[in-house]
Swiss-Prot record:
Organism: Geobacillus sp. (strain WCH70)
Lineage, uppermost ranks: Bacteria, Bacillati, Bacillota, Bacilli, Bacillales
NCBIfam families: PRK03081.1, SASP_sspK
GO BP term, example: asexual sporulation
Keywords: Sporulation
Chain's gene name: sspK
Induction: Expressed only in the forespore compartment of sporulating cells.
Protein's name in the database: Small, acid-soluble spore protein K
């Protein structure tokens, strides 16, 4: 039996509905397939976001 069927609470406050958290500005690849520049700065900025759910 899965947790969902047993009515377990959402313990980590995970968000399962709505828009995905991944944003194009933090992606490693651009829409045209080229590699995005400055990966260290991009990853640092991604970790500092306020929408942590």
């Amino acid at each position: 039996m899965r947790n969902k069927e047993r009515n377990f609470p959402n313990q980590n406050n995970n968000k399962f509905e709505g828009e995905p958290r991944a944003k194009a500005e933090y992606a490693s690849k651009r829409a045209n397939g080229t590699t995005n520049t400055h990966p260290q700065e991009r990853m640092h900025a991604s970790g500092k976001r306020d929408d942590n759910f």
